[in-house]
């Protein structure tokens, strides 16, 4: 059973977060291992496995990028497979330039302002890619969606680096 079906949701990228959380809580209550404490060993083990599956499913569906990755996995695309190389050299060059730019920001006297501008630009890039991804998933163009998800993963890592630098600048 796929994660969407487990939560009684249609298989599509856009998910009602409130409904997802509500169904998660219902499933947690229904299959919590403590409810099976006096049950036979096989039922207790099944409850533990179900609880783990429910938690994994919730985490996968809750986060937009993980949800897209999961949807692609349902169609045979493993975006976590590092053997698939990024062939978009323009995107890779852009990533190198962005990382170099981020590396130089901390050395600047106006690092806070420059980092804010950089973070805003990055958010626009992420928003644009997410829009492309949503369109590709909705239209079931799985190969294009997988490519976009891989690009979003690069941008997501860059976003994490921005947040780390923001914390470092606050600690100064």
Swiss-Prot record:
Disulfide bonds: none annotated. The keyword Lyase does not apply. GO terms for cellular component: iron-sulfur cluster transfer complex. Keywords: Chaperone. One of its GO terms (biological process) is protein complex oligomerization. GO terms for molecular function: ATPase activator activity; protein-folding chaperone binding. Residues 2-74 form the J domain. The keyword Chaperone applies. It comes from the Bacteria. NCBIfam families: hscB (TIGR00714), PRK05014.1 (NF003449). Belongs to the HscB family. Interacts with HscA and stimulates its ATPase activity. Interacts with IscU. Co-chaperone involved in the maturation of iron-sulfur cluster-containing proteins. Seems to help targeting proteins to be folded toward HscA. This is Co-chaperone protein HscB.
């Amino acid at each position: 059973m796929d994660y969407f079906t487990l939560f009684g949701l249609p298989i599509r990228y856009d998910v009602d977060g409130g409904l997802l959380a509500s169904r998660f809580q219902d499933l947690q209550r229904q299959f919590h291992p403590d409810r099976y404490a006096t049950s036979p060993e096989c039922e207790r083990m099944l409850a533990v496995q179900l609880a783990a599956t429910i938690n994994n499913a919730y985490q996968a569906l809750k986060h937009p990028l993980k949800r897209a990755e999961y949807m692609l996995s349902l169609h045979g695309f493993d975006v976590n497979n590092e053997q698939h190389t990024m062939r978009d050299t323009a995107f890779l060059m852009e990533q190198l330039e962005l990382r170099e730019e981020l590396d130089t920001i901390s050395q600047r006297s106006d690092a806070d302002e420059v980092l804010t501008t950089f973070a805003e630009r990055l958010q626009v890039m992420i928003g644009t890619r997410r829009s492309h991804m949503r369109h590709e998933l909705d239209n079931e163009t799985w190969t294009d969606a997988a490519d976009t998800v891989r690009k979003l993963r690069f941008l997501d890592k860059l976003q994490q680096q921005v947040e780390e630098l923001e914390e470092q600048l606050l600690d100064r």
